[in-house]
């Protein structure tokens, strides 16, 4: 269902911290033009943790409206309370989204059985396709391959965004799940290797400002043309790494503003503006990447 470069879209805001509709439209048009395979609306990069539930729903619905069926939309619907995750997921059932991205519950650190029961409950309360999202560096809990395998038995749990950066995970998961279970990287620096090991694509932060390059890289890799894919990835590697010097999405929002994709790099507290030292490193990485002009 989902293969190639999928963007983890930033949520543009004006200087007052309100959602910027015009910048969101520009971002969506940019990804349609450059053949990004899908948009994730309101994931980690979209600042889900600092939006109210009403804003969360508003942004997803606005993204759907502005995309106008030109590109598939995946909605982030995870929460650390199972009832809240179910409620949010059900709000989108008739919206037109293609799937939900459901992060592991953060802060409360459930056991593997707790994680299984959490995702099982969501699956049983909706018909929407679910993509599991494992990012222990953010959430404080790790969805292990054995638990992923148990969850893969549910028909509407169709895959996982695996963002540990641990390439051994793909081998472990692949051995335990059916061939049609989607394995999607959530880590730009290791995404190409992830695809080469059998993954179907990446949900990418870098794609916010390098949509064409990420689409080309993933397409080459999925075709088995790893020489061409690596040529692109080598240009992007410094950029991949520099975008995580500070917590995501601080660097990517600043860079998106710098190249003219959004009007403001406003973030909500506790996220704070980018440091000057980080700007310098990103500017060097941007120059090395030699991206297509916007």
From Swiss-Prot:
Keywords in alphabetical order: Amino-acid biosynthesis, Cytoplasm, Diaminopimelate biosynthesis, Lyase, Lysine biosynthesis, Schiff base
Transmembrane annotation, as ranges: none
Keyword Lyase: yes
Reactions mediated catalytically: L-aspartate 4-semialdehyde + pyruvate = (2S,4S)-4-hydroxy-2,3,4,5-tetrahydrodipicolinate + H2O + H(+)
Main location: cytoplasm
GO biological process: diaminopimelate biosynthetic process; lysine biosynthetic process via diaminopimelate
NCBIfam families: dapA
Protein name (Swiss-Prot/TrEMBL): 4-hydroxy-tetrahydrodipicolinate synthase
Organism this protein belongs to: Buchnera aphidicola subsp. Schizaphis graminum (strain Sg)
Lineage of the species this protein comes from: Bacteria, Pseudomonadati, Pseudomonadota, Gammaproteobacteria, Enterobacterales
Gene: dapA
């Amino acid at each position: 269902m989902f293969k190639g470069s999928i963007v983890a879209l930033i949520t543009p805001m004006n200087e007052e911290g309100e959602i910027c509709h015009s910048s969101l439209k520009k971002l969506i048009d940019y990804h349609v033009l450059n053949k990004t395979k899908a948009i994730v609306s309101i994931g980690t990069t979209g600042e889900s943790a600092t939006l109210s539930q009403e804003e969360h729903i508003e942004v997803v619905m606005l993204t759907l409206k502005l995309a106008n069926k030109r590109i598939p939309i995946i909605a982030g619907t995870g929460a650390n309370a199972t009832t809240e995750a179910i409620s949010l997921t059900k709000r989108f059932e008739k919206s037109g989204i293609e799937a939900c991205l459901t992060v592991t519950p953060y802060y409360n650190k459930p056991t593997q059985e707790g994680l299984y029961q959490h995702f099982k409950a969501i699956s049983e309360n909706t018909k929407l396709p679910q993509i599991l999202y494992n990012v222990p560096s953010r959430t404080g809990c790790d969805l292990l391959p054995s638990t992923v395998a148990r969850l893969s038995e549910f028909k509407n749990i169709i895959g996982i965004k695996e963002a540990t950066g641990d390439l051994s995970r793909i081998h472990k998961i692949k051995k335990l799940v059916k061939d049609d279970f989607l394995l999607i990287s959530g880590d730009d620096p290791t995404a190409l290797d992830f695809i080469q090991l059998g993954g179907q694509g990446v949900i990418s932060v870098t794609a916010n400002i390098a949509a064409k390059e990420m689409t080309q890289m993933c397409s080459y890799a999925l075709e088995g043309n790893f020489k061409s894919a690596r040529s692109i990835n080598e240009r992007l590697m410094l950029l991949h790494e520099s975008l995580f010097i500070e917590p995501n999405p601080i660097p990517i929002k600043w860079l998106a503003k710098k190249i003219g994709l959004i009007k403001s790099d406003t973030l909500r507290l506790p996220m704070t503006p980018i440091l000057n030292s980080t700007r310098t490193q990103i500017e060097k990485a941007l120059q090395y990447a030699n991206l297509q002009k916007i």
